[in-house]
């Protein structure tokens, strides 16, 4: 149930670019971090290359692409190896979509506490406890 924000900059243009990015991010998040794509939310935003600076120069000036991915997941649900594999796979796939990437391209796996994070009006901790008690999460809230 991650919430993922993708900001990107590229000179490549395609009517399906944002959908391609969202699809790739969803696929790798499911495959490597084991997150259910049916409860994954992805926001994709384009940033003009003249407005993105890395290493002191704009991406437009350097003729390079970049992205910033911020993914929120429940704390302790992924290993260090999974997170490292996710960053590496994402860098490779996003380069295929966006073109040559600036070395200063970032991804942040933000591990948040289950009692402070959730969706549909319920925290992840409440869902976890309800699952252990074998009751519906909304009934556990009553």
Regions found by a protein language model. Give the residues of each.
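A domain-level signal for the structural core that forms small-molecule/cofactor-binding pockets
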Residues: 1-142
